[in-house]
């Protein structure tokens, strides 16, 4: 769903910032 992909994108960006 939309929220699932949004969460995945958030984790991806978050790990990139770290």
UniProtKB/Swiss-Prot annotation:
Q: Which residues carry this modification: Leucine amide?
A: 18
Q: Which tissues is it found in, per the record?
A: Expressed by the skin glands.
Sorted keywords for this record are: Amidation, Amphibian defense peptide, Antibiotic, Antimicrobial, Cytolysis, Fungicide, Hemolysis, Secreted
Disulphide-bonded residues: none
Q: Where in the cell is it found?
A: Secreted
Main localization of the protein? secreted
Gene Ontology CC terms, in alphabetical order: extracellular region
- GO biological-process terms attached to the record: defense response to fungus; defense response to Gram-negative bacterium; defense response to Gram-positive bacterium; hemolysis in another organism
Purpose of the protein: Has antimicrobial activity against Gram-positive bacterium S.aureus and Gram-negative bacterium E.coli and strong activity against yeast C.albicans. Enhances the antibacterial activity of XT3. Has strong hemolytic activity against human red blood cells.
What name appears for this protein in its UniProt entry? Antimicrobial peptide 6
């Amino acid at each position: 769903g939309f929220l699932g992909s949004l969460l995945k994108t958030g984790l991806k960006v978050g790990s990139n910032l770290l």
